[in-house]
């Protein structure tokens, strides 16, 4: 049918709700927490195990909106459309919607999370009584170093029998 069209069309906008479409990520808001990846029932969204990336395969997206509803930063907008680029083959290709600089543990230098996610978390918890001093610094450590730091700190509060 595409071959018979009088002119090539890259995409056809569709009304919502539609079973086809893309996502628009506000990269200024997205912290790359990847909550959307876990929420996607069709595996349209995926992470990259090698580096902080949010990847998307449009043919898998059913525009259910679970990703947008799960996003704590409200950085996802559904874009109902039928993408016809490259004869419709582009819809089947995984593409990167967002990527970020990895954050490195302040103790062992291992990458974990993203710079933006850690900065956002530290900022949100800055006024919380449980995240002051050494506890605030632990937010900048990977999970392993956080546990080691708590158990090797002589000043850490210990649970004892009363």
Regions found by a protein language model. Name each.
Residues 1-53, 60, 70, 74-126, ...:
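Ferredoxin-type iron-sulfur electron-transfer modules and their immediate structural context
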Residues 129-131:
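Catalytic cores of glycan-processing enzymes that make or break glycosidic bonds
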Residues 139, 157-162:
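C-terminal accessory/interaction regions of large nucleic acid-associated machines
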């Amino acid at each position: 049918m595409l071959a018979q069209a009088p002119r090539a069309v890259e995409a056809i906008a569709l009304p919502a709700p539609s079973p086809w479409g893309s996502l628009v990520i506000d990269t200024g808001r997205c912290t790359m927490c990847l909550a959307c990846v876990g929420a996607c029932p069709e595996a349209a969204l995926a992470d990259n195990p090698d580096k902080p990336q949010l990847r998307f395969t449009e043919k898998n997206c059913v525009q259910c909106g679970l990703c947008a509803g799960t996003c704590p930063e409200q950085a996802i907008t559904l874009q109902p459309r039928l993408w016809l680029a490259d004869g419709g083959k582009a819809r089947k290709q995984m593409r990167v919607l967002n990527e970020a600089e990895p954050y490195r543990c302040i103790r062992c230098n291992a990458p974990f999370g993203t710079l933006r996610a850690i900065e956002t978390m530290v900022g949100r918890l800055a006024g919380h009584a449980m995240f002051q001093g050494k506890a605030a610094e632990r937010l900048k450590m990977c999970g392993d170093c956080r546990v080691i730091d708590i158990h090797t700190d002589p000043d850490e509060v210990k649970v004892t029998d009363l």
